[in-house]
Amino acid sequence: MWFPRIDPAVPILAKPSPNETDLPSIATQSHNEPFHMTAGLAARLDRISTHDRYLIVPMDHGITMGAVKGLVDIESTIDGVTRGGADAVLTQKGIAPRVHPNKNDAGYIVHVNASTTIGPDENDKRVTATAEEAVRAGADAVSFHINVGSDHEPEQIEELAELTDDASRLGLPVLAMAYARGPGVDSTDPEALGHAVRLAEEVGADVVKTGYSGDGDTFTRVTESTRLPVVIAGGSKGTDRETAEMVRGAMDGGAAGVSMGRSIFQHDDPEGIARTVSAIIHDDADVDAALQAGGFSDA
């Protein structure tokens, strides 16, 4: 039997002096530092990252695509990616009992909305859990998917705003998966991606995931649009070298890491490819060194 970790009580702080009640100046904050921070929020962000770098492996695809490769025996996959260096794994709430015995020291994120590939509109994500339900499932954070530019953008903005409010009361971090998607929207356009990540910050998220613009130079325009840590989506599975090159380019463009699903959990060696990605994110390795770290002959 597993038991959710309980935070130590937050100490009662002395009443601040008048000048300490002023809000911090944006000009004095470092890039990619969350504006609001409590002890509980900071502790939970530490559980899903390492030194403010993120290797998150989302495995919520079962609700979207069914029991695809890598998710049938999700316990083994979770064990492999966490041994490979994943900072956190992510699932829907119903998978929580299968996660906790297998995630080693990794953090756990519960995703709280979904759609399916066989439904009428995959962009129409519906709420599947609340922040409180996520806490009961043992989550260290919650995540929410919003398609900026889609027909469903208005209600998704409202739902994300409600989630950030509820989560903030619990000291629970929110990862906003903010994609540029919709009629006439280029999902790799740095301006559209920059708009998406800024929206996430404006609505109160703590970390934001978005698509990759294709190279580090253009991705810099995305990361400079927000003070939140920006992590990139992995997209469909490529070669090992393509995956490593994408991660290296994103990090060079100011990313704080990745939230990479199929490229890791559907790999023939999830532990090895996780080690490759981790080497770039956490050790600042180049592509060849990262491939060697994962044990791949492509190096």
Regions found by a protein language model. Give the residues of each.
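Conserved N-terminal beta1-alpha1 strand-loop-helix module at the mouth
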Residues: 2-7, 11-110
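Short helix-terminating capping/connector loops at secondary-structure junctions
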Residues: 50, 168-169, 290
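A C-terminal functional module that forms or caps the active site or interfaces directly
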Residues: 237
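Short acidic/histidine-rich active-site segments
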Residues: 258-265
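Alpha/beta enzyme core
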Residues: 54-58, 62-89, 96-98, 107-116, ...
